[in-house]
Amino acid sequence: MKAKKKTICLMLVTALIVTMCALPVLASGTPINVYVNGQPAPTTNLLINDVTYMPARYLLELLGVQVEYKDGSVYINQANQVKGPVKISTLTENSNENHPDLINEFGLSMFIDTLDCNVLFDTGKLGNIPENAKKLGIDLKKTDCVVLSHAHYDHCGGVKTVVENVKPDDYTLYVGKSFFDNLQKYHYSPGGGPKLDFTDGHKGYTYIGTNFDKAYLDEHKVKIKYVDCDEVKLSKQISLFGNFKPGAVEKMNPAMQLKVGDKYIQDEFTEEIALTVDTNKGLIIVTGCSHTGILNIVETIKERTHKPIYAVLGGTHLIEADAARIQHTIDAFNEMDIEKIGLSHCTGTLAIDTIATQIPDKVFYNSTGTVIKVK
């Protein structure tokens, strides 16, 4: 019944768009773009003598449709489209403070459960996710898609465990288009630096890439698909986003290096991808490390989808940020009116404490065992 109502509503909206020229409330000498539910809509029927005519927005809104005019384009979204329930479980993260029965590690992995698609987003560092998943009541064999946000060991370390031990019934691995070109990842320390998970601070280069390559995946007959465009849809509710351009404020960490031949160059993380879940409250954005900038990722997705952001979950890499950048991030989150911010992994103590102090009603620590549900 719900599907029938949704179809009828979409038909009404489409019919109204096709007959727009009968109600020329807004006319533009320059043809404009029309988007329905984030997708481009044909406007050939709306052109009269090279003038684009738009309908009375009020008639659309009576049908439960949101209409937004912006930058020479019209965005039409069916406000009454009901999405299915969503459950996001953090299988592993740096801390297990709230769930001491689960295994924590320096890494990140989340499981996204929707009606028509189950996604394992990143796999942590050590391959402990099957044990944690079992305790959380999650059957990893029901995984439809495995998504790797980028090619670092603390997000891809559990891949072999998934491939060789979990062996999901039928799944596809999704990675950024340059993932396998960017496997030779290193961290450079000038010496005397802080002790980190992967280094004691000694001078030199430390390998921080994956423990597998494409040949390994091919040997185990893993199906691979690449995120080689701005957006790839996994299901009606879940999408992957890539092609994040370098931001003006959030600079790349010069310590993150890529080995090409016998040379080291700045790692631009061109393979980095993020995931979104479309819910009844707005988009949930799931990130791995946000090496390309957490605001850059969130703002890019908002610009591409023209949908409200309900929540942001995952790593933000604000661990490297100074007070000014952290404050800039807080201001931007407030401006976008994001309701929930689940900080994880590489966010850093200073950023977590600062953000939690300023917007305590929105922020929580998304640690091992945290479960988010949206009906």
Map each language-model feature to its residues.
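Primary recognition of N-terminal secretory signal peptides and signal-anchoring hydrophobic helices
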Residues: 1-82
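Conserved beta-strand hairpin/beta-sheet module of binuclear metal-dependent hydrolase folds
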Residues: 87-136, 268, 272-287
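Pre-active-site segment of Zn-dependent metallo-hydrolases
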Residues: 101-102, 116-145, 256-259, 294, ...
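Active-site neighborhood of phospho(di)ester-bond hydrolases with catalytic His/Asp-centered motifs
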Residues: 120-123, 143-151, 174-177, 285-289, ...
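Active-site metal-binding motif and surrounding structural segment of the metallo-beta-lactamase
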Residues: 128-180, 302-311, 334
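Metallo-beta-lactamase
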Residues: 181-273, 335, 364-375
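Active-site-proximal loop/helix segments of hydrolase catalytic cores
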Residues: 252-255, 260-309, 316-317
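C-terminal regulatory/interaction regions
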Residues: 339-340, 347-375
